[in-house]
């Protein structure tokens, strides 16, 4: 969950008491702590709902890598607005207004789903040939 660095740097390290509502940590730190708590349970299924929205892209990348390698046998359902959060998924479901508009892998959706392609371009600034 990429939490060790900032937790270790706290005055009391892993013995630090968090304030009510976690007001003594940032939004991204709260998200990483929530992910860490979920991982401690070693779940068979892990549902992450926009769980890295307050985390910088470099940390998000490290979290994705750790989830892939450390939880290889865990089914992960990731709800995200950032395409980078899901582009390596086995399957991506694109939704708009509560309706499924596309299902597939990243490369397939880039070619076949205009909505997915537009989101990708807006988030990365990279043009794509359909």
Residues covered by each model-derived region:
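Conserved catalytic segment of ABC-fold P-loop ATPases
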Residues: 88-94, 114-115
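Conserved "ABC signature" C-loop
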Residues: 1-17, 58, 115-118
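Catalytic Walker B motif of ABC-type/P-loop ATPase nucleotide-binding domains
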Residues: 46-49
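ABC ATPase "signature
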Residues: 103-104
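A short, proline-enriched helix->beta-strand linker immediately N-terminal to the Walker B motif
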Residues: 40-44, 73
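Conserved catalytic loops of ABC-family nucleotide-binding domains
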Residues: 69-80, 86
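Helical segment within the ABC ATPase nucleotide-binding domain
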Residues: 60-72
């Amino acid at each position: 969950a990429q939490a060790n660095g900032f937790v270790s740097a706290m005055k009391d390290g892993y013995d630090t008491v968090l304030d009510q509502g976690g007001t003594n940590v940032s939004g991204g730190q709260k998200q990483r702590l929530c992910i860490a708590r979920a991982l401690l349970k070693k779940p068979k299924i892990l549902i992450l709902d926009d769980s890295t929205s307050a985390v910088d892209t470099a940390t998000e990348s490290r979290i994705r890598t750790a989830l892939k390698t450390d939880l290889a046998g865990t089914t992960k359902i990731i709800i995200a607005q950032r395409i980078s959060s899901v582009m390596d998924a086995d399957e991506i479901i694109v939704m708009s207004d509560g309706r499924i508009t596309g299902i597939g892998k990243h490369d397939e959706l880039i070619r076949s789903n205009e909505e997915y392609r537009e989101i990708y371009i807006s988030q990365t600034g990279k043009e794509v040939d359909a």
